[in-house]
Amino acid sequence: MNKQNIQKTLVLLPTSALLAGCLDATDNPANKITPTPNADGKYNIIFITTDQEAYMEQYPAGSNYAARERLRKLGTTFEKHYACANVSTSSRSVIYTGRHITETCMLDNTNYAFVNDMSRDLPTVGDMLRDAGYYTAFKGKWHISEDTESLEEYGFSDWTEGNMYGSVWEGYKEDGTIADHAIDWLKSKGKQLNNDGQSFFLAVNFLNPHDIMYFNETPGTYIAGEATPAPDDPVYKKSYNVPVPASWNESFDKPGRPAAHKEYNKQWQDWVGPSPTDSLGWQTFRDYYFNTIQDEDNHMLVLLKYLEKAGLLNNSIVIYTSDHGEMQGEHGLKGKGGNIYENNIHVPLIIYHPEMKGGRHCYNLTSHLDLAPTFVDIATAGNVQQFSAITQELHGHSLMPAVKNPATDIRNSEGALFCFEMISMIDGDYVMNPSLKPAYRADMNKRGFVRGIITPDYKFARYFAPVKFNTPADYEALWADNDVELLMCGTDETENLAWPKDNNANQQLVELMNQKLNALIQREIGTDDGSETKKGYKGGVEMYDKNKYDQ
């Protein structure tokens, strides 16, 4: 049911019926939970994703994110969880395979003609959990191939929504439908599976807050061919007294700031219109962003209500996260892309388990690479041999030890790896002309690809050209082929501690972080030579290098 139909239906319902369907976010559903594994001795897994939602330590004052608050009370909140790649296609390929983009070869969004579908030979979470005896179903946004009717070749059944990328107002229009389809599936297929003694994995992929991508209130201007102010809906009327990031007007020409940030900003504004030019504009932008989250939260609350009403919180583990973040004006940027700033790659993660106490917090590092092993750990239910057999090619870690004991160190010592290889975002002066062959051309000498590492204390990244993959062994080699960035965690991330190269008091720290990054790449990727670009891009990156053409 889309938003317009919902509004028409509400008019016909009596107020008492509407109130009866509301959840009181102040009650404690944990009091009603009795852990009850299914007849196969396992729990269902209900995996909820949002799109473009950055981590928030505290929700904005005045919001009513009842679904998220409910999950926080019920589950374990992972406070330092990071995406491994941006944007949607890349990150989702990691989530649904447990492999970095160097293996999935999903380097850019599939709606570009130069991007291939993900290989159907690559095992997905759906395939892995089927091997563990689960029925696997998928609802909502996919965006890892151009399929429009079925995901059976990717290990998932019962996908009915078709491929959605997150177009103008698509979250506003379709998130209610996604929730409805998930509930309908649970009432019919899910219930029958459990009655027959089989556990299931259900992925519910919402679209919002992705609608923020196209927000624009400037009269007479258009994005993606449409004027895109906020919808005329009560959910979108609220304003929040939340300060904009102090770095909203940070210069892109600031000494030490990677040039990739300026290129990205030029590219992004060409795609979706100019960014706000003052703090008030960013405040309006963020108000809309918080309201898109509220809109999605309302639909997620309906889903959680059904889980509680149907008793599915007794026999299901619920996991909620987002594919990547949204900059929201931090460092003068909007959107998501190739940088290691907090709003870009720090995302929410909550895991509810019927057997575990709720309201707990894990403050240790975790990563999207860890989700697939977590799913398999749940699905194999203590069968160590089966778990090892299914995950032998994965490099992430199960998060279940941290669900049982939030103090458990998952990857503090080794760090979390971030990879970025989108040719569509590296050149602000790109050429897109359908009459040209190829139609898309960018400067492949610009340093816009990223390898980054997040540790408990620092973030470190090197930005390099698509035609200059490298694994620098020393300080001089590091600077020869890369723009280098070192940020201290817990700060506003406006000081690049790696800059300047010469006579830098932090040189030893930079060298240490480079060594840690190299070690993590070796562990989770192996040889990092860019060979994936020949598979992920039709013809390889050189095909789209405008330096090879007369301009």
Predicted segment positions?
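Bacterial N-terminal signal peptides that target proteins for export
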Residues: 2-11
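Catalytic-site neighborhoods of secreted/periplasmic enzymes
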Residues: 94-202, 207-228
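Active-site-proximal N-terminal segment of extracellular/periplasmic enzymes that hydrolyze or transfer
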Residues: 28-79, 85-86, 482, 497-505
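Active-site-proximal cap/lid insertion segments
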Residues: 39-41, 55-56, 61-62, 194-198, ...
